[in-house]
Amino acid sequence: MENFKHLPEPFRIRVIEPVKRTTRAYRDEAILKAGMNLFLLDSEDIFIDLLTDSGTGAVTQDMQAAMLRGDEAYSGSRSYYALANAVKEIFGYEYTIPTHQGRGAEQIYIPVLIKKREQEKGLDRNKMVVFSNYFFDTTQGHSQLNGATVRNVYIKEAFDTDVDHDFKGNFDLEKLEQGILEVGANNVPYIVCTITCNSAGGQPVSLANMKAMYQIARKYDIPVIMDSARFAENAYFIQQREAEYKDWTIEQITYESYKYADALAMSAKKDAMVPMGGLLCFKDNSMEDVYNECRTLCVVQEGFPTYGGLEGGAMERLAVGLRDGMRQDWLAYRISQIEYLVQGLEKIGVVCQQPGGHAAFVDAGKLLPHIPAEQFPAQALACELYKVAGIRSVEIGSLLLGRDPKTGQQLPCPAELLRLTIPRATYTQTHMDFIIEAFKRVKENAKNIKGLDFTYEPKVLRHFTARLKEI
């Protein structure tokens, strides 16, 4: 299918879900009842749901069929071994623990690694710092709940929507090593490499940067955890943008990437395409003691280590989804859909982050310059977009970043972004055109959009359940 300007979706739609159309008055009332928080809206009141791509997309026919093979044995399920074999084949990792989703893995490995560093290296919990190219919100939350200070060490181009860079998700390697030396390597229990880097706009990390980061980690004997929700999209960007790997397959790039970490934690609801599921996996016997301790915690918090909160059919589906999510034509279509949306928005004067994976990221700070960061311009924009068109999106800015747990002050956010997250194989190009038209209407009324303030503010992960009002 070469030399066509636009290729259609590379799949056939067999099952559909009807959606409800609502009026502007209905939506105005709904968002007020939800406390200006789109997480608190009912899904039936959403026309196009761009809140997340996590477990919200379609599954393939092979994934659905695989569920019929499910072995529901409490322990030693053959479905577990199907999943563990898929992990070994794709990532090269020897030890696998299934979890119900990514945060299930986080609540297990984070306290174990902190305890190990404390026992073996004399970690001082009052000085404990963990590093990432940018922590996902729940990874940050679990780290803080366990007493760690989080530091995101990203390159200067990462959040600059006026600058293009092939790998905006990269670590600032100099800042990483300086930070380790500043706090003392013994006080750093782990480094997290997030691929793709969600908070920077679904931006990829290059293989060269992964290698260099891992060399620094080895130098100071710090374990590296690959936050792997969008591993396949990251591999696709490496193939397309890093010349050394242009002739490599997605499978080859993925396998190579995971040489530069010691463990992986995954929300499988993204690139593995399942509606529920997660993984915690360890590369080899150098992490066997951590693996054994995590297995013990898994029994208490998730379930027996050969099911981890997942039914047998779900593990079979995940084993297939890991492979299906790496298809070359699928990834090319998915990334081109994001590019189409970003290009359409920029044509009408809506500034966006350079197209990455899984979402278009609108620069709300530039669209609403009259709203200061402490009044959450991206959240205000999200509310207006819902009122205008029934589209649910999500703020990636000051509201999500939250407060310094020690001082209570709002943490400075590098950019106020609105994420338009595209669920897999769910929306067509016509939907993208509708989103662009909706933004045209929002832009026309931008100067009248008001900032927001709290009426209820949770102390941790506040963006999920906070309630706000217009100022």
Curated annotation (Swiss-Prot):
Q: Which cofactor does it need?
A: pyridoxal 5'-phosphate
Pathway(s) of this molecule:
Amino-acid degradation; L-tryptophan degradation via pyruvate pathway; indole and pyruvate from L-tryptophan: step 1/1
Give the enzyme class.
Answer: lyase
The record ties this protein, via PROSITE patterns, to: BETA_ELIM_LYASE
Identify residues that carry N6-(pyridoxal phosphate)lysine.
270
Catalytic function, reaction form: L-tryptophan + H2O = indole + pyruvate + NH4(+)
Q: Which Gene3D superfamilies match?
A: Aspartate Aminotransferase, domain 1 (3.90.1150.10), Type I PLP-dependent aspartate aminotransferase-like (Major domain) (3.40.640.10)
Q: Which UniProt keywords apply?
A: Lyase, Pyridoxal phosphate, Tryptophan catabolism
- Write out the GO MF terms: tryptophanase activity
EC number, as in UniProt = 4.1.99.1
- Pfam families membership: Beta_elim_lyase (PF01212)
Domain of life of the source: Bacteria
Q: How does it assemble?
A: Homotetramer.
Q: Which PANTHER family match?
A: BETA-ELIMINATING LYASE-LIKE PROTEIN-RELATED (PTHR32325), TRYPTOPHANASE (PTHR32325:SF4)
Family classification: Belongs to the beta-eliminating lyase family.
Protein name as catalogued: Tryptophanase
Species of origin reads Histophilus somni (strain 129Pt)
